[in-house]
Design a protein with these regions (language model features):
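Short acidic-glycine-tyrosine-enriched beta hairpin
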Residues: 63, 89-112
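Conserved catalytic SET/PR domain of SAM-dependent protein methyltransferases, capturing the structural core
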Residues: 153-294
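Glycine- and acidic-residue-biased ligand/ion/polar-headgroup-sensing regions
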Residues: 77-94
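Conserved short histidine dyad/triad with adjacent acidic residue
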Residues: 57-78, 108
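Double-stranded beta-helix
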Residues: 116-160
Length: 294
C-alpha cells in the first residue's frame, strides 16, 4: 500500500520526475503505469494508516483505517474475497466510487483512488491461518518496489539498533545466560500457540535488530495492552518473537494464568505500507515477571 496526502485541489508534490499531479490526471492513470507511479510516491512522506488484524474461526479480516484526503495504491489482491466498507467514501482510479456501508466480492487486482472521507475498509478472507507473513503470501502480490522497501527497512542500521544489540550482550551477563540459550528458547516450538480470537495491532516481520521481530501495524497508546505473550505456560508470538532493547517501548505484566505485553509509551503504527515501530522489551524485566509465575 502507498498513500499520500493531496490538497483541496487534488495536488501533491512528487519528486523527482514531476512536480504536481492533478486529481483528474491521477484518476486516469493507466494500470500499467501504477508500479512506476508507486515508486514515485514512495519518495513522499507516507500518511499514517492503522491496519488491524482480526482473527476468528475460519476468517481473517484485515482492517485499514484510511484518512480523508489521500490517494492510495493498494497491494495487488491475488484471489477473490469479500470487501466491506463500514463507512467512508472512495473514488476509484479509472472511474467509479464506493460509499459506506458497502459490501461486494473483490476480484483479483489493485484498488487505487482518492479517499474522499475517512474510511474503514475490510478485506475478509476465508482461512484459519494467523501468521501475517504467510497470509500476505497467500492473498497479496506485492510489487517489486514494495518488496525492495521492506528489505531495505529490515536491513537499516540506526543508533537504536546498535544500542539494542550492545545492551543484549550486557543482558546476557546480567542474567547469566548465553546467546545460544536465548536463541534455543526463542526457536523452541513445542509450547507455541496461536493468538486467541480477536483483533491485534501488530505483526511479525524481519527486524533490523535481529532475525524476526514484532512490529506495530496501528497506533498503540501508552498503557494499552498489546496482547497475551503467555497463556497457561504456552507462548504466543509475543512470547517468543519480541526483540530486546535498551530503550523498550513495552513491558511484561503478570495476568491470571499468564503474561501480557503492555505499551510503555505511545507506539507509532503503519505509515501506508511501511511497518510501524518495532515492539521491544527489556528481557531483564520480562524474566522477573516470568519467574514470579513459577
Amino acid at each position: 500500500m502507498t498513500i499520500y496526502r493531496v490538497d483541496e485541489n487534488g495536488e501533491a508534490s512528487v519528486k523527482p520526475i514531476v512536480t504536481t499531479f492533478d486529481f483528474a490526471e491521477l484518476m486516469n492513470v493507466h494500470p500499467v503505469d501504477l508500479e512506476e507511479l508507486e515508486q514515485d510516491f514512495m519518495t513522499l512522506d507516507q500518511e499514517p494508516v492503522d491496519v488491524i488484524h482480526h482473527f476468528y474461526p475460519g476468517i481473517y479480516m484485515r482492517e485499514a483505517r484510511l484518512p480523508k484526503g489521500c490517494f492510495l495504491i493498494g497491494h495487488k489482491q491475488a484471489k477473490p474475497h469479500l470487501n466491506l466498507m463500514l463507512n467512508g467514501y472512495v473514488g476509484f482510479l479509472g472511474g467509479g466510487e464506493a460509499k459506506g456501508p458497502f459490501m461486494a466480492v473483490g476480484e483479483p487486482g489493485r484498488k487505487c483512488g482518492v479517499i474522499r472521507e475517512e474510511t474503514a475498509w475490510y478485506n475478509i478472507y476465508a482461512t484459519d491461518e494467523t501468521d501475517i507473513g504467510t497470509l500476505e503470501s497467500m492473498f497479496l502480490e506485492k510489487s517489486d518496489a514494495a518488496i525492495a522497501q521492506e528489505i531495505e527497512l529490515a536491513q537499516a542500521e540506526t543508533d537504536e539498533t546498535v544500542a539494542a544489540r550492545a545492551d543484549y550482550l550486557s543482558m546476557l551477563l546480567d542474567l547469566d545466560v548465553t546467546h545460544e540459550m536465548v536463541s534455543a528458547m526463542s526457536a523452541y516450538k513445542d509450547d507455541r500457540i496461536n493468538l486467541p480470537w480477536g483483533a491485534y495491532k501488530f505483526r511479525s516481520a524481519p527486524s533490523p535488530i535481529h532475525g524476526n521481530g514484532v512490529f506495530a501495524s496501528a497506533r498503540i497508546e501508552a498503557g494499552e495492552t498489546i496482547g497475551p505473550a503467555n497463556i497457561n505456560g504456552k507462548r504466543t508470538v509475543l512470547g517468543y518473537g519480541i526483540n530486546h532493547s535498551a530503550n523498550p517501548n513495552a513491558y511484561a505484566v503478570a495476568t491470571h494464568g499468564g503474561i501480557s505485553v503492555v505499551a510503555k509509551r505511545d507506539i507509532t503504527g503503519n505509515r501506508a505500507g511501511v511497518f510501524g515501530e518495532e515492539i521491544t522489551m527489556d528481557y531483564r524485566q520480562s524474566r522477573k515477571v516470568a519467574l514470579c509465575l513459577r
